[in-house]
Amino acid sequence: MADIDPARPLTEPPAERARAIPRGRMALLFAVMLTTAAGNTAMQSVMPSIGTSLGVDDVWISLAYSWSALLWVVCAPFWARKSDQRGRKAMMALGMLGFIASFVLCGLILWLGLAGIFPALWCLLLFAAARSLYGGFGSAAPPAVQAYVASRTPRAERTQALSLIASSFGLGTVIGPALAPFMVLPVVGLAGPFLVFALIGAITLVAVRWRLPNDEPQFPARGTAYESPHSGSPPNEVGKDESDEDDAVGAEPGKLRWFEPRLRPWVVSGLLGGHAQAMVLGIAGFLVLDRLGLRGDPAAGAGPVGLVLMAGAIATLLAQWGLIPRLDLGPRAAS
């Protein structure tokens, strides 16, 4: 029997640990999440000014983009399951196409409406229809990104990798309102942020199609449905249970019910917290316009509204990146 080298570990580390996702690919996944969140929160920062310019009551503006959030809630679990069947890259591409199409159409519709070509009512109805593309198809990208990372990352490194992806979502809620005032362009006016973020989304889509390889998962994982990105709200994952990481290879995941006993406390807390956050965001922009007396000059309100939304998002990121790690408030152990 050969002598055992005491300096050599008795068990070799698994080969998968050397196959972490390369930084270039991780940057692409980061960009997909960042673009999705930043574009949506940029829209939220200019819509109060657009609604005032169109002469539409505040409540109808809030309902117009709340409709897409409702579609996101309904469609995201469906796309999460599809990403397990059709591949993560395909669902990312579909989600980015939905994002691009929605923002291009919304930008053109609002541009024509602000120019007086469309009546305010038709402009609002067409805007809500175009936003349906974002809620219906844009919701395919975040679950696919999460599943791509989970399926290609060993369990020991999975939490860190998924935290990075979650931080991109949160960072987008800061960047979107910060950039929106600078995207109010001379020709298209307040519709500028829609068209600029559509261009950014197109660049991201090309990079994903060109640089991201077709996914062949090394580890079992299932798609997870992210909630619609709102300014200042962390990206909660809908329908994820800690036992998902321990699923056997090849096992067919069962379809989770809305009131699954294991998830009921998280669903209720997410429902209450999400509604509270959405109500604040629904009135924050209009409140800023009223308090600053900018109803007569709505274009000047994009900057202050964006600043308020950005401040709320920064507060959330400070808790997510600073307070939670400092207090060691990690997730419960999977075992």
Regions found by a protein language model. Give the residues of each.
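Residue-level signature of mid-helix packing/kink "hotspots" within the transmembrane helices
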Residues: A69-P77, T173-V174, A313-W321
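Cytoplasmic helix-loop-helix junction between adjacent transmembrane helices
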Residues: A130-F169
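Juxtamembrane intracellular "pre-TM" segments in multi-pass secondary transporters
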Residues: A2-R23, P213-S269
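C-terminal ends and interior cores of transmembrane alpha-helices
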Residues: L97-A120
